[in-house]
Amino acid sequence: MAAHILSGRPVVESLHARIQQVLARRAPHQGPPTLTVLLPNDPSAQAYARAIRKQFTTLSLNYRTEEIDDTLDESRFAILLKRLAEDESVTGILALQPLPKGVSRRSLARLMPPTKDVDGVSFEQQGRLAIGSPWIAPSTPLGGLILLQHYGIEVAGRHAVVIGRSPVVGRPLALLLLARDATVTICHRRTPDLAKLTRQADLLFVAAGQPHLVKPDMVAPGAVVIDFGVSVRDGRLIGDVDPAVAEVASALTPVPGGTGPVTTAVLALNLLRLAGLLEENDLFPGAP
């Protein structure tokens, strides 16, 4: 039996409705929150920025860009972030990848002002997530779990296998899963016999950045598979999971149209948190 396809569209519609309810309750003197995107000269980043702009326009949220070039060094990057941190009209800041060559991810984590960190990259936000008290969680992994919640797929008590350990998806995803009472295994490029572990998963999350890495024989019958991968092959978007996995899994996110749109909607939710319009414990809207 073919897997149930976990489309991101109804999840986005539900999140948009939640966001519009929150915005409708804000005080009369409060304007809409404003996101500033640090935009490199990179086609993938620019495509993502357009997707953000499209959703934010639909939601009547303010959106700005600051173009950054590859020659920007750490000192000038620090000046830019300091200026945005002091700008009262800026609610949140998002630094799109790739970063300038002179700016490391560690530098970004150190320099990003935590109170305007819309994607949970700062040391403070990462630390809060690590101790199980997140305020702003990275939008991609959080979006994946909100998607599961939307479709009524339980996380607690299940074995979740995560392929990928990046600081923006795999690692924070593992911490979020632990906070939701899953039993978590993390796999990466040095993991021996990857398929042996993936076949043990009730929930398989794939964020490896390798097109069609996961084949049907790597998935347990009835498993739920969440694909965070996005690559371009022959002019079309493909994920880290071979579409043939749909013949084995019970549920599977598509690429495109799965986790990607949900990620963007979660950025909007995070912006509302930074604006003080959502409670700290409202990490999973609608969750018990």
From Swiss-Prot:
Q: Which residues bind NADP(+)?
A: 164-166, 230
Q: Which CDD domains match?
A: NAD_bind_m-THF_DH_Cyclohyd (cd01080)
Q: Which UniProt keyword terms apply here?
A: Amino-acid biosynthesis, Histidine biosynthesis, Hydrolase, Methionine biosynthesis, Multifunctional enzyme, NADP, One-carbon metabolism, Oxidoreductase, Purine biosynthesis
Return the GO cellular component terms, semicolon-separated.
cytosol
Q: Which reaction does it catalyse?
A: (6R)-5,10-methylene-5,6,7,8-tetrahydrofolate + NADP(+) = (6R)-5,10-methenyltetrahydrofolate + NADPH; (6R)-5,10-methenyltetrahydrofolate + H2O = (6R)-10-formyltetrahydrofolate + H(+)
Q: Gene3D superfamilies, alphabetically?
A: Leucine Dehydrogenase, chain A, domain 1, NAD(P)-binding Rossmann-like Domain
Under which EC number(s) is this enzyme classified? 1.5.1.5, 3.5.4.9
Gene Ontology MF terms in the entry? methenyltetrahydrofolate cyclohydrolase activity; methylenetetrahydrofolate dehydrogenase (NADP+) activity
Q: Does the keyword Magnesium apply?
A: no
Under which pathway is this protein filed?
One-carbon metabolism; tetrahydrofolate interconversion
Q: Which InterPro entries match?
A: Aminoacid_DH-like_N_sf, NAD(P)-bd_dom_sf, THF_DH/CycHdrlase, THF_DH/CycHdrlase_cat_dom, THF_DH/CycHdrlase_NAD-bd_dom
Q: Which Cys residues form disulphide pairs?
A: none
Whether Amino-acid biosynthesis counts among this entry's keywords is yes
Give the record's family classification: Belongs to the tetrahydrofolate dehydrogenase/cyclohydrolase family.
Q: According to its UniProt entry, what is the function of this protein?
A: Catalyzes the oxidation of 5,10-methylenetetrahydrofolate to 5,10-methenyltetrahydrofolate and then the hydrolysis of 5,10-methenyltetrahydrofolate to 10-formyltetrahydrofolate.
Q: Subunit structure, briefly?
A: Homodimer.
Q: What is this protein called?
A: Bifunctional protein FolD
The scientific name of the source species is Thermomicrobium roseum (strain ATCC 27502 / DSM 5159 / P-2)
